[in-house]
């Protein structure tokens, strides 16, 4: 292979690596956002459950804000 062909092959490999890396990052960001949203919902459910029990809400007044 000539020097020109090797340069073209190198650029194609770099381009392919960049495209794969970019799409992988976007997919990972979407998965992280979904996991974060699910965790937030689970935490909210746990706090609501705690606030409905007098003993738990008494220990965690900063979370329950006086509601039961």
Curated annotation (Swiss-Prot):
Propeptide intervals in chain numbering: 22-48
Keywords associated with the record: Acetylcholine receptor inhibiting toxin, Amidation, Disulfide bond, Ion channel impairing toxin, Neurotoxin, Postsynaptic neurotoxin, Secreted, Signal, Toxin
UniProt tissue specificity: Expressed by the venom duct.
Compartments, record wording: Secreted
InterPro entries for the chain: Conotoxin_a-typ
Annotated GO CC locations: extracellular region; host cell postsynaptic membrane
Ranges where the record places region Ser-Xaa-Pro motif, crucial for potent interaction with nAChR: 52-54
Cysteine pairs bridged by disulfides in the record: 50-56, 51-64
Domain notes from UniProt: The cysteine framework is I (CC-C-C). Alpha4/7 pattern.
Function: Alpha-conotoxins act on postsynaptic membranes, they bind to the nicotinic acetylcholine receptors (nAChR) and thus inhibit them. This toxin inhibits mouse muscle alpha-1-beta-1-gamma-delta (CHRNA1-CHRNB1-CHRNG-CHRND), and weakly rat neuronal alpha-6/alpha-3-beta-2 (CHRNA6/CHRNA3-CHRNB2).
Name of the protein in its database record: Alpha-conotoxin Lp1.4
Classification lineage: Eukaryota, Metazoa, Spiralia, Lophotrochozoa, Mollusca
């Amino acid at each position: 292979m000539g020097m020109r062909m090797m340069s073209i092959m190198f650029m194609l490999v770099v381009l392919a690596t960049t495209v794969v890396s970019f799409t992988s990052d976007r997919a990972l960001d979407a998965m992280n956002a979904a996991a974060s949203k699910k965790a937030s919902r689970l935490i909210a459910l746990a706090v609501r459950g705690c606030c409905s029990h007098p003993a738990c809400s008494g220990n965690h007044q900063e979370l329950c804000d006086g509601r039961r």
